[in-house]
Amino acid sequence: VNSRSVPVGNRRPLLGAVAELVNATNAFTPLTRHGYPAIGVFAFGWPTSENAPLVIAGSALGALRRALRGEYRSTSGRISLLLKVVSWVLLAVVHRRAVTSRPYFEDPLSEVLGPQFPPIPPRPGGVWATGRTRRRFVEKTVRYGPYRSNVADIWVRTDLPKDAKAPVLLQVPGGAWMIGMNRPQAYPLMSQLADHGWICVSIGYRISPKHAWPAHIVDVKRALAWVKANIGAYGGDPDAVYITGGSAGGHLSSLAALTPNDPAYQPGFEDADTSVAGAVPIYGRYDWITEGFPERRQFGSVLERLIVKLPFTDNRQLYLDASPITHVGPEAPPFFVLHGTHDTLIPVEEAREFVEKLRAVSQAPVIYAEIPYAQHAFDVFGSARGHYTASAVERFLDWARATRPE
């Protein structure tokens, strides 16, 4: 089509259709995984890949409106409609990949836990369950430490007895160690667990660049200490505390699980118990030191400039100590690690290396679910993968609780 021969107003449907096709293609397979453009690839690909039916519906309604106005009668109009149809086909494939991904969550659990455990239930509600997340269980927000960001939402059923001795899950939010937004992360997981009798504690913590490392992990440890000392008043069991988190929260939750009671990360509360009975890091960062591929070198520069604020060459031990992969050992608690193959923010190789090293030394089970075609943050929405993640994590946690030594 010769753009000079098409009036600007008539080009809008074509330009919009091209944009939709690029977006659908990016959801189908990331346009790039390298450099800062990968952030934009995630920003558009993530919501599209997890909410594909809604994107199709919105596009189809727009196409219907334009058709009623006769905008598809011209050559450029017909081309734009064709591009839209191609986008819908790609998005339909994206959605099918998501709704058929249950075995990738379930099979790793069955291999380790055995077939006697109930399977992950089919996703309820059909495609229109996409995006349904609820905060129905937050009884109150508490302060667990002296800093402004040291707050936590307590997710608990209002009818839970105060002597229930319910298991507890501490949720550590992600955000590149620079965005301390615990809402609305892990809502599908926490609402499901709370509904089934768990207590969930979703925390905030100090973030960079205002605060330098290790303030972040110190706050996570402080939150664990608070939970151990106070959760009994809400009906929780301080001896059955588990931890999870995604992205930076995956890093912090795994580091906390692998460094129980480490005084270096517990200034002023060195004697507090910060051990956990199990960990579920999701699309986390586990290595702050190895430069095995270009993406890690770029990540290292971000650490030096914004998070640690100290050069790696002069502070190698600090970066080593901040890497969960450094702390793997035989005493590690049970782990359930999840990661998507289409993650453009943290490569899936990060999880593979961590799991390999942890399995080589840990005496406890290490379960790894690698989810094909899943972007970063695939569990945030109430999508198919959000449901499968919540059900798989609950199944793992119930097993860890049932087999926990008394």
Protein language model regions, located:
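Alpha/beta-hydrolase superfamily serine-hydrolase fold, recognizing
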Residues: N2-E406
